[in-house]
């Protein structure tokens, strides 16, 4: 098979930002995305903008389609991989992703791989899998202050035409900045009343005492009519809560606006890596308080025990698809600092077994134990019983799969799901044996606060 080549043009990036490039390229585009990253207070080397959809891969109600045409399959992730994978000519100046597909896999995608009860309504009605193959990608190299316009393909004339179009858009004027208000102030309503959530926690504690599970994550969804443009939410969120996985994915029927703190799964095509995060403290006022809080976190038996449980779950998930003897735990139980909090983090890696792909690993890991519980299958059965609706995108993953199998998928947390004129925010609390129901309810609201603050900022005008 002939390799896909990165046809590209390179410019100085001193007159553009990822936001301005996105606004220029995405104007009137049916689908578009912006992926950025801020880790440990610093912007990562690359930001990526993509527009257009050469192909759209969609899964809903057991029907997998490519550009609207049905494809028969029992394994939608394998079907996606087989249609995306192609030999790729890499370039040393470009990041792991400059062509392939970008999108999300919902929490409920697990139903295609595990038998779970179907007790609750799917009120959002969104796809379980939705990925697009962009026509043009703009890569910002913040280290070298360069902007690469890339049109991946095999036909140089066709790729050059796409580059010409994108260059004209970039050199044109900045269009109107999305920020218009739909009117009114957001009024978020929870899908659980306070008492109903407390009762769900009490029932979860009964399951824990009976020995069914060690932990289950019960989430609360907050919903409001949309009052601002989704991109205004993104601009506010990147200011309020800069995170390792910033994402704005306008996929047509749904928009994801994310400031996720957590990687679900990364791969270079052969090696797979997951990084469970469990255990949290706020950042200190200064370096000395930071150090004290980190030491306190490492001494907290409850936090450490919960982390070790989820670390074991991640190790088992990777072990299902890795070659024998290749699963390793790197840097177990170390403290990482983020903009507002610090977390206990471990790294688990393995080498894919013969015949396994990165998307087989995604099927094994999804959903992560940090959003479901342990043991995972029984915890998900209890979630289906106790939560009022299907979760949809929340608790799943979003990110990219490059043509050659390189992949980076984040956990869909701290994310607005915008669809059908509504915006939804969902947050969960891990219920364990000594949980206090009232505190778990407050934890859900506390986790949602950064997103609610972003709504207020966007409504006030940026």
Curated annotation (Swiss-Prot):
Domain of life: Bacteria
Alphabetical list of InterPro entries matching this protein: ADC_synthase, Anth_synth_I-like, Anth_synth_I_N, Anth_synth_I_PabB, Chorismate_C
Sorted UniProt keywords: Amino-acid biosynthesis, Aromatic amino acid biosynthesis, Lyase, Magnesium, Metal-binding, Tryptophan biosynthesis
Cofactor descriptive note: Binds 1 Mg(2+) ion per subunit.
Gene3D superfamilies registered for this protein in UniProt: Anthranilate synthase (3.60.120.10)
EC category name: lyase
Cofactor(s) the protein needs: Mg(2+)
Pathway the protein contributes to: Amino-acid biosynthesis; L-tryptophan biosynthesis; L-tryptophan from chorismate: step 1/5
Ligand binding (chorismate): 279-280, 394, 414, 428-430
Any GO BP annotation: L-tryptophan biosynthetic process
Pfam family, one: Chorismate_bind
Catalytic activity: chorismate + L-glutamine = anthranilate + pyruvate + L-glutamate + H(+)
Residue pairs linked by disulfide bridges in the UniProt entry: none
Residue sites binding Mg(2+) per the record: 306, 443
Residues annotated to bind L-tryptophan: 37, 244-246
Activity-regulation annotation: Feedback inhibited by tryptophan.
Enzyme Commission number: 4.1.3.27
Subunit note: Heterotetramer consisting of two non-identical subunits: a beta subunit (TrpG) and a large alpha subunit (TrpE).
Function summary: Part of a heterotetrameric complex that catalyzes the two-step biosynthesis of anthranilate, an intermediate in the biosynthesis of L-tryptophan. In the first step, the glutamine-binding beta subunit (TrpG) of anthranilate synthase (AS) provides the glutamine amidotransferase activity which generates ammonia as a substrate that, along with chorismate, is used in the second step, catalyzed by the large alpha subunit of AS (TrpE) to produce anthranilate. In the absence of TrpG, TrpE can synthesize anthranilate directly from chorismate and high concentrations of ammonia.
NCBIfam families: trpE_most
Protein name (Swiss-Prot/TrEMBL): Anthranilate synthase component 1
Species of provenance: Thermus thermophilus (strain ATCC 27634 / DSM 579 / HB8)
Organism placement in taxonomy: Bacteria, Thermotogati, Deinococcota, Deinococci, Thermales
């Amino acid at each position: 098979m002939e390799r896909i080549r990165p046809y590209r043009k390179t410019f100085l990036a001193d007159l553009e930002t990822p936001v301005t490039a996105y606004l220029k390229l995405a104007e009137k585009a049916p689908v578009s995305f912006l992926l950025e990253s801020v880790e440990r207070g610093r912007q990562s080397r690359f930001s990526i903008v993509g527009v257009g959809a050469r192909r759209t891969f969609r899964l809903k109600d057991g029907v997998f389609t490519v550009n609207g045409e049905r494809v028969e399959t029992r394994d939608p992730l394998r079907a996606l991989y087989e249609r995306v994978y192609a030999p790729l000519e890499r370039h040393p100046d470009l990041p792991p992703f400059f062509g392939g597909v970008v999108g999300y896999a919902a929490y409920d995608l697990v139903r295609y791989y595990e038998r779970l009860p179907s007790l609750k309504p799917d009120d959002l009605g969104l796809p379980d899998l939705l990925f697009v193959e962009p026509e043009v990608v703009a890569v910002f190299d913040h280290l070298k202050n360069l902007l690469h316009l890339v049109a991946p393909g095999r036909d140089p004339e066709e790729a050059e035409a796409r580059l010409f179009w994108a260059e004209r858009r970039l050199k044109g004027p900045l269009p109107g900045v999305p920020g218009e208000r739909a009117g009114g102030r957001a009024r978020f309503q929870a899908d659980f009343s306070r008492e109903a959530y407390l009762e769900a926690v009490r029932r979860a504690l009964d399951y824990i005492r009976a020995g069914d599970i060690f932990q289950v994550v019960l989430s609360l969804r907050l919903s409001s009519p949309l009052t601002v443009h989704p991109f205004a939410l993104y601009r506010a969120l990147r200011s309020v809560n800069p995170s390792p996985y910033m994402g704005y994915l306008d996929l047509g029927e749904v928009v994801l606006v994310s400031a996720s703190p957590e990687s679900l799964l990364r791969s270079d095509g052969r090696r797979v890596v997951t990084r469970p995060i469990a255990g949290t403290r706020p950042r200190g006022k200064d370096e000395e308080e930071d150090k004290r809080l980190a030491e306190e976190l490492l001494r907290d038996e409850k936090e450490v025990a919960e982390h070790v449980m989820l670390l074991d779950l991640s190790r088992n998930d990777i072990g299902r698809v890795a070659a024998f003897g290749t699963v390793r735990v790197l840097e177990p139980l170390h403290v990482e600092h983020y903009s507002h909090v610090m977390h206990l983090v471990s790294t688990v890696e393995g080498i894919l077994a013969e015949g396994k792909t990165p998307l087989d690993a995604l099927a094994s890991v999804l959903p992560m134990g940090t959003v479901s519980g342990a043991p995972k299958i029984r915890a998900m059965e209890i979630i289906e019983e106790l939560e009022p609706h299907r979760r949809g995108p929340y608790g799943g993953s979003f990110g990219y799969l490059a043509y050659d199998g390189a992949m980076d998928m984040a956990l869909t947390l701290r994310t607005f799901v915008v669809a059908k004129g509504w915006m939804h925010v969902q947050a969960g609390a891990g219920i364990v044996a000594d949980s206090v129901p009232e505190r778990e309810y407050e934890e859900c609201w506390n986790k949602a606060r950064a997103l609610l603050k972003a709504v207020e900022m966007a409504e006030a005008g940026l």
